[in-house]
Amino acid sequence: MAWALLLLTLLTQDTGSWAQSALTQPASVSGSPGQSITISCTGTSSDVGSYNLVSWYQQHPGKAPKLMIYEGSKRPSGVSNRFSGSKSGNTASLTISGLQAEDEADYYCCSYA
């Protein structure tokens, strides 16, 4: 029986100094090894829709969050090109292609507001 990865997406935040709104992600996303999955992050025209400043973080249990994507689609040095970011309107997305066991983690998005 094929096993599935469970990619939890439980926490989102806006990072502006006066931000009150929250971004919306699915509670969980799952996929099988080798598949591609996309995690959405929906905001408003005041945050995600207005700025190309969405960041995505990966966090494994007991570890510090790791920056995976910044400014919507840029990857820091050392981050696999299996991770990609995009945006359409008020929704940003993180796509992970060729899922691997080590991709099982929490993924957080944040946006300037």
From Swiss-Prot:
Q: Where is this region: Framework-1?
A: 20-44
Stretches the record annotates as Disordered: 73-92
This entry carries the following GO cellular component terms, namely: extracellular region; immunoglobulin complex; plasma membrane
What PROSITE patterns does UniProt report for this protein, alphabetically? IG_LIKE (PS50835)
Q: Which residues carry this modification: Pyrrolidone carboxylic acid?
A: 20
* Signal sequence, start to end: 1-19
Q: List the disulfide bonds.
A: 41-109
* Region annotation (Framework-3) ranges: 74-109
A single Gene Ontology MF term assigned here is:
antigen binding
| Keywords for the protein's UniProt record, in alphabetical order | Adaptive immunity, Cell membrane, Disulfide bond, Immunity, Immunoglobulin, Immunoglobulin domain, Membrane, Pyrrolidone carboxylic acid, Secreted, Signal
Q: Where is this region: Complementarity-determining-1?
A: 45-53
Region feature Framework-2, mapped onto this chain: 54-70
Q: What is its main location?
A: secreted
Q: Where is this region: Complementarity-determining-3?
A: 110-113
The residues covered by the Ig-like domain are 20-113
Task: Relate the assembly described in the record.
Answer: Immunoglobulins are composed of two identical heavy chains and two identical light chains; disulfide-linked.
What is this protein for, i.e. what is its function?
Answer: V region of the variable domain of immunoglobulin light chains that participates in the antigen recognition. Immunoglobulins, also known as antibodies, are membrane-bound or secreted glycoproteins produced by B lymphocytes. In the recognition phase of humoral immunity, the membrane-bound immunoglobulins serve as receptors which, upon binding of a specific antigen, trigger the clonal expansion and differentiation of B lymphocytes into immunoglobulins-secreting plasma cells.
Protein's recorded name = Immunoglobulin lambda variable 2-23
To which species is this protein native? Homo sapiens (Human)
Tell me the lineage of the source organism.
Eukaryota, Metazoa, Chordata, Craniata, Vertebrata
Annotated gene: IGLV2-23
